[in-house]
């Protein structure tokens, strides 16, 4: 989270999750810090985007299972990005891990895989779609996943 939200934190605790504040400069630095810091407390960490209305419990379970045999899991998106990233090894997440990765673009997945070229194995999950442009909102409404 960018700011502390007492209601969200309370709900997360009710279902056995922990919510933390983000720190770092850009998105890559914040993601890196969240993965590295989270792995100091837990064996596996998933960062999940908030713009994928079709991401469900089954997909999250695939991501967790993907970390059984990999140090990193990526949930692909149809547009070349990803809807989640996870890890099981804190040593992967050094300060320059996302350097050169064009996050938020159609190149995010490809760039991230290049940035992870020294990490093996990496699990890549089947692509989902996320909401980035007005047509995606229409798609979500037509599928009944957004009002």
PLM features per residue range, with description:
Residues 11-44, 105:
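Short phosphate-binding loop-to-helix
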Residues 53-82:
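Conserved donor-nucleotide/metal-binding helix-loop-beta segment in metal-dependent transferases, i.e.
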Residues 48-50:
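Active-site acidic Asp-centered loop
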Residues 91-113:
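Short, glycine-/small-residue-rich phosphate/pyrophosphate-handling segment
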Residues 78-95:
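Conserved catalytic core of nucleotide-sugar-dependent glycosyltransferases
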Residues 2-6:
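A conserved acidic beta->alpha catalytic loop
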């Amino acid at each position: 989270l960018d700011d502390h939200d007492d209601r969200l934190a309370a709900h997360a605790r009710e279902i056995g999750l922990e919510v933390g504040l983000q720190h770092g400069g850009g998105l890559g630095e914040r993601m890196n810090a969240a993965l590295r810091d989270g792995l100091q407390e837990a064996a596996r960490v998933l960062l999940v985007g908030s713009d994928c209305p079709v991401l469900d419990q089954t997909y999250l379970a695939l991501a967790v299972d993907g970390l059984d045999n990999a140090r990193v899991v990526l949930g692909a998106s149809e547009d070349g990005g990803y809807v989640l990233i996870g890890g099981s090894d804190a040593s992967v997440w050094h300060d320059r891990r996302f350097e050169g990765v064009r996050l938020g673009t159609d190149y995010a997945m490809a760039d991230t895989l290049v940035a992870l070229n020294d990490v093996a194995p990496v699990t890549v999950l089947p692509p989902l779609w996320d909401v980035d442009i007005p047509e995606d909102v229409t798609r979500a409404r037509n599928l009944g996943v957004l009002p």
